[in-house]
Amino acid sequence: MKSRIHVLQGDITQLAVDVIVNAANSSLMGGGGVDGAIHRAAGPELLEACQKVRRQQGECPTGHAVITIAGNLPARAVIHTVGPVWRDGEHNEDQLLHDAYLNSLKLAQANGYKSIAFPAISTGVYGFPRAAAAEIAVKTVSDFITRHALPEQIYFVCYDEENSRLYNRLLTQQGDE
């Protein structure tokens, strides 16, 4: 059976998948890194949708996820999840990162989405070590898809070659590619 998990190197904002995941901050108001890139590419409709979510439920806690429209993106929707800031690994960061991936997958499944694309959550300015973050991402996604039919296709979208190699190596070790 062809693998359901894929690694791509490039710009997550260009993917025509059902839903892309935004590594958001708790304010949901946009920021740097992939968060800023997604907001810029999606246009003002995304910020308006995030403001509406925030008015309804307040900030998005670390490890949680919310879903909005995609604005001008080719994706159908955006799931915004808040990964943890790395603080030496002594503040439940591993579990919170796991929760960010898991809650994103659950939202995609609940909305019937067949394809989802993830950035490397928390590995930019939040400082989560790349190798540890990739292991958590791959394990969380792999465990989820063994028990669920949706999403059918999961993409890890890496901004650079180093992360791409890291994810490919982990998937090869698991026998998923």
From Swiss-Prot:
Active-site residues, record numbering mapped to chain: 35
Residue positions binding substrate: 11-12, 25, 33-35, 122-126
Catalytic activity of the protein: 3''-O-acetyl-ADP-D-ribose + H2O = ADP-D-ribose + acetate + H(+); 2''-O-acetyl-ADP-D-ribose + H2O = ADP-D-ribose + acetate + H(+)
GO molecular function: O-acetyl-ADP-ribose deacetylase activity; purine nucleoside binding; ribonuclease inhibitor activity
Pfam families: Macro
Keywords: Hydrolase
Cysteines joined through disulfide linkages: none
Enzyme Commission identifier(s): 3.1.1.106
InterPro entries (UniProt xref): Macro_dom (IPR002589), Macro_dom-like (IPR043472), O-Ac-ADP-ribose_deAcase (IPR024900)
PROSITE patterns in alphabetical order: MACRO
Similarity annotation: Belongs to the MacroD-type family. YmdB subfamily.
Name by which UniProt lists this protein: O-acetyl-ADP-ribose deacetylase
Lineage summary: Bacteria, Pseudomonadati, Pseudomonadota, Gammaproteobacteria, Enterobacterales
This protein's encoding gene: ymdB
